[in-house]
């Protein structure tokens, strides 16, 4: 069962969001060897440990529903989606061990145990449950993915993805020398660079610029100059 006292006052959805998005931004935007970039591996380990804590419960937002013609609709939907509502610490709670829903008349709050959704199949199951429940407020959020509960699931999916783990491994073990940028394919993807040079008959610098324009989100003149060590005179 779950009670309000079980919620963590330190690690919450905002903590996970900052850890996930900041990690990706610093890994991309800072040079290899930068202390802040290297520190992110410790942040990853600490975040992983927090998510693996069976006592951690994350707030996943609320829904509101009031219809005089269907006063039991919210309760019925909760019980058909999560399980039977029971009184715990004077609260009406449905709890399947992963997702808990606290019902209070016209409102229901969601709480999620991240330790229990470690696999993609578990994430998919709880995601489907939350999509069903948050559909009651589709007029407020416009689309299901804008509800905090669904955004929390997507953050968990991002943080636990193979791509995110590969990013962590790359920070720990990179071929790029200290001071260089992963965004420079001359340093980070020499094999791919050589293939592009051969196929398109380009110089090393031209091939690097071609790849940056093709794959990176912000290959501005300023950024490319920083990544590649180019100056206006060059």
Which residues are covered by each model-predicted region?
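Long, compositionally biased low-complexity segments enriched in polar/charged residues
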Residues: 1-186
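Catalytic cores of nucleic-acid ligases and guanylyltransferases
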Residues: 181-183, 196, 212
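Short, Lys/Arg-enriched N-terminal segment that forms or immediately precedes the first helix
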Residues: 186-199
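Residues within the helices of the helix-turn-helix
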Residues: 194, 222-223
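Short amphipathic alpha-helical interface segments
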Residues: 199-219
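Short amphipathic alpha-helical interaction segments
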Residues: 227-234
């Amino acid at each position: 069962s779950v009670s309000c006292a079980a919620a963590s006052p330190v690690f919450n959805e905002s903590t996970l969001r900052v850890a996930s998005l900041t990690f990706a931004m610093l890994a991309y935007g800072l040079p290899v060897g930068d202390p802040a970039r290297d520190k992110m591996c410790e942040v990853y380990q600490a975040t992983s440990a927090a998510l693996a804590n069976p006592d951690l419960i994350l707030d996943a937002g609320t829904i509101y529903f009031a219809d005089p013609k269907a006063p039991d609709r919210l309760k019925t939907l909760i019980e058909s989606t999560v399980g039977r509502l029971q009184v715990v610490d004077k609260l009406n709670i449905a709890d399947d061990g992963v997702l808990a829903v606290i019902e209070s008349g016209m409102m229901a709050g969601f709480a999620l145990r991240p330790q229990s959704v470690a696999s993609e199949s578990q994430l998919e199951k709880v995601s489907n449950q939350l999509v069903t429940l948050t559909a009651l407020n589709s007029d407020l959020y416009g689309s299901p993915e804008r509800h905090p509960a669904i955004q929390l699931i997507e953050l968990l999916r991002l943080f636990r993805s193979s791509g995110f783990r590969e990013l962590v491994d790359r920070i720990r073990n990179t071929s790029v020398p200290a001071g260089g940028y992963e965004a420079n394919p001359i340093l980070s993807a020499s094999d791919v660079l050589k293939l592009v040079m051969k196929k398109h008959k380009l110089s090393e610098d031209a091939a690097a610029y071609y790849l940056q324009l093709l794959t990176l989100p912000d290959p501005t003149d300023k950024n490319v100059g920083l990544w590649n060590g180019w100056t206006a005179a060059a």
